A protein has these predicted regions:
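Conserved catalytic submotifs in the C-terminal HATPase_c
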Residues: 117, 122-132
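PAS-associated C-terminal cap
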Residues: 1-15, 19, 246
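Detector for a conserved hydrophobic position within an alpha-helical segment of the HATPase_c
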Residues: 219-220
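Conserved micro-motifs of the catalytic ATP-binding
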Residues: 90-95, 132-135
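Short alpha-helical segment of the dimerization/phosphotransfer core of two-component systems
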Residues: 70-75
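Short conserved segment of the HATPase_c
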Residues: 185-198
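Conserved C-terminal segment of the DHp
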Residues: 44-59, 88
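Conserved glycine-rich
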Residues: 224-225
């Protein structure tokens, strides 16, 4: 066998071993997270059912029933998110294809048009038309949409939001970035937890602490890497790297 082909096969095997090792560590941590979250939901249901059993006032009973309905919706949401994480961490051989990066950013921008217009947001996309990665389309769609949604969600209330999206080939890598001038993140305080499951860093009622975890997991499942730079009240930049060969 040609030495270059043998070397390529060796690199592919090493990469597969590394990915599998990372996924196994995630699943071990995931078991603890499931246990913690389901116990929390169970305790909430038990408490509300206890209140309902002891309550005699009909108005108060209805209020508790509404709270039970909300608790049920929250549980379903949690199970849905956990299911997504399981799928990412256990399906490493999902069919891949060439994914046009600019196409997915344009589609995400179109989906978010109502929010963009309502909040007078400026989005600039500077990506070569033919720049692509070898990945999983559904993962890539979620990654792009989640990062743009985050930028919009965590904008500064009294400042026009500008989002700059760039993409290029660099030193054998496909690199694209999403830069905003939003409220930013204190990385000295939160950097080591930024991509953790159920970690939130802002007082936003919509924050669930799952989006960035799923985003990072999907990027890594496709052989990529994500890094972040940020400064409070200045903005945040996410950079995603994929090998050209993927």
């Amino acid at each position: 066998m040609d030495i270059s082909v043998l070397k390529q096969k060796e690199n592919e095997l090493r990469h597969l071993i590394d990915v599998t090792s990372v996924q196994n560590k995630k699943l071990a941590n995931f078991a603890h997270i499931i246990s913690h979250n389901l116990r929390s939901h169970s305790a909430n249901f038990s408490m509300l059912l206890g209140f309902l059993k002891d309550e005699t006032d009909e108005v108060e009973k209805q209020r508790i029933l509404n709270m039970l309905s909300d608790a049920s919706s929250n549980l379903l949401g949690t199970l849905d998110n956990l299911n997504k994480v399981v799928e990412i961490n256990t399906h490493t051989n999902v069919a891949r294809e060439h994914v046009n990066i600019k196409k997915y950013f344009l589609e995400a921008k179109n989906i978010l048009t109502p929010k963009i217009k309502k909040n007078d947001i400026e989005i600039n996309i500077n990506i070569p038309q033919n720049l692509s990665v070898y990945g999983i389309p559904s993962y890539f769609e979620n990654i792009v949409l989640n990062l743009l949604t985050n930028a919009i969600k965590y904008r500064q209330p009294n400042k026009k939001l500008n989002i700059n999206i760039n993409g290029k080939k660099e030193f054998g890598k496909i690199v694209f970035s999403i830069q905003d001038n939003g409220i930013g993140i204190n990385l000295n305080r939160h950097g080591d937890k930024l991509f953790g499951m159920y970690k939130t860093f802002h007082n936003n009622s919509d924050a669930r602490g799952i989006g960035l975890y799923i985003t990072k997991s999907q990027i890594e499942a496709m052989g990529g890497n994500i890094i972040v730079s940020s400064e409070v009240n200045k903005g945040t930049t996410f950079k995603i790297y994929f090998d050209e060969g993927y």
